Each structure stands twice: as structure tokens, then as C-alpha cells.
From Swiss-Prot:
Residues 107-139 have a biased composition (Low complexity). This is Dehydration-responsive element-binding protein 2D. Keywords: Activator, DNA-binding, Nucleus, Stress response, Transcription, Transcription regulation. Induction: By high-salt stress. Belongs to the AP2/ERF transcription factor family. ERF subfamily.
């Protein structure tokens, strides 16, 4: 009897150890990985030894395991698992975060959000062909835009001395140049009386 009792105790201890190991691998992939892996409750999620979280899911009918990627947090990995589970198992999928079903962004864009080129617009999308102003408001919109743009322009332009330009123009026509403050108007009398031969060349185009 004494030799049988130790064997029974050893068999019982081995069964208990195997039970603990089997239970540690249910749900979240526990039993290995980073320090927070043991406390993870998300299905298909585990932590690497360097702290990153990974997610994977098995195909229906005990198929192959699909790798879903590496994530910074366990929640991100759980959301990735839920997204894949909805595609593989449909509405019957067991989700980690069912309350986040609506808030989680869709991986594929919906048909309504896609813009298709129109034959009437020469391949341009509808967003490109739309104008910020309607046809009846185009003129008012342009005026408002011009007023706003000129209102915010504050440039200190330099003051130009254009006296030399006017002097050169009058000399080319044969007129005397009168400087500011010059009260001698005798030269204008000469111009009026026909003293300058170029006066006839200065005529109206009409």
C-alpha cells in the first residue's frame, strides 16, 4: 500500500498540471509572451515579450490561422480581431468588444463614399466640378472675395519721384519743362505763339 500511494499522488499532480496548462491557453493566447499577457482577456490576442500586442484568428471549420498584425495596445489588437471575425463569421461572430462595433472604422470604403468619374465631366469627380458659389451668386461671390483680399493687404509702397519721367516726356515733345515754383511763364507764351516747331505734331487723334 505504501508503494502505491506515491504513484497515485504523482498521477494526480500531473493531471492537475496539465489542466492548468490547458486552461491558460483558452480565450486569449496566454501561457507565453510579455508581462501583461496573463491578464489579457481578449480572444485571439497576445503580447510579445518586448511589449507589442499581436492578433490572429482561425478560419471557419478549424482552418488555418490568419495573422492580423502587430499593435501597440491590446485594445487595438482586439478591434482588429473583431473586424476579421465579422468578415469570417458574420453576425454570429463572438466579439471581444461588441459595444465598439459602430465606432470602429470600416476597413473598406462603402460604395456611397467612392467617387466615380462622370462621362459628362470628362473624368472629373463630382467634388472637383462643384463650385463654392452657385451660378446666380458668382458675381457677388467674386466681389466679396476681392474685397476681402484687398482688405487684408497692407503694403507700404515707396514714394517715387516721377518728375524726371515727366521732364523727359515733355522734352521729347518740344515743350519747356517748368519746375515746381517757377513763375516764369514767358516760355509758355512762346509755345502758344508757335515758337516750337513740334507743336503741330502734337495733335488729337480725332
Amino acid at each position: 500500500m505504501s508503494s502505491i500511494e506515491p504513484k497515485v499522488m504523482m498521477v494526480g499532480a500531473n493531471k492537475k498540471q496539465r489542466t492548468v496548462q490547458a486552461s491558460s491557453r483558452k480565450g486569449c493566447m496566454r501561457g507565453k509572451g510579455g508581462p501583461d499577457n496573463a491578464s489579457c482577456t481578449y480572444k485571439g490576442v497576445r503580447q510579445r515579450t518586448w511589449g507589442k500586442w499581436v492578433a490572429e484568428i482561425r478560419e471557419p471549420n478549424r482552418g488555418a490561422r490568419l495573422w492580423l498584425g502587430t499593435f501597440d495596445t491590446s485594445r487595438e489588437a482586439a478591434l482588429a480581431y473583431d473586424s476579421a471575425a465579422r468578415k469570417l463569421y458574420g453576425p454570429e461572430a463572438h466579439l471581444n468588444l461588441p459595444e465598439s462595433l459602430r465606432s470602429y472604422p470600416k476597413t473598406a470604403s462603402s460604395p456611397a463614399s467612392q467617387t466615380t468619374p462622370s462621362s459628362n465631366t470628362g473624368g472629373k469627380s463630382s467634388s472637383d466640378s462643384e463650385s463654392p458659389c452657385s451660378s446666380n451668386e458668382m458675381s457677388s461671390c467674386g466681389r466679396v472675395t476681392e474685397e476681402i483680399s484687398w482688405e487684408h493687404i497692407n503694403v507700404d509702397l515707396p514714394v517715387m519721384d516721377d518728375s524726371s519721367i515727366w521732364e523727359e516726356a515733355t522734352m521729347s515733345l518740344g515743350f519747356p519743362w517748368v519746375h515746381e515754383g517757377d513763375n516764369d511763364i514767358s516760355r509758355f507764351d512762346t509755345c502758344i505763339s508757335g515758337g516750337y516747331s513740334n507743336w503741330d505734331s502734337f495733335h488729337s487723334p480725332l
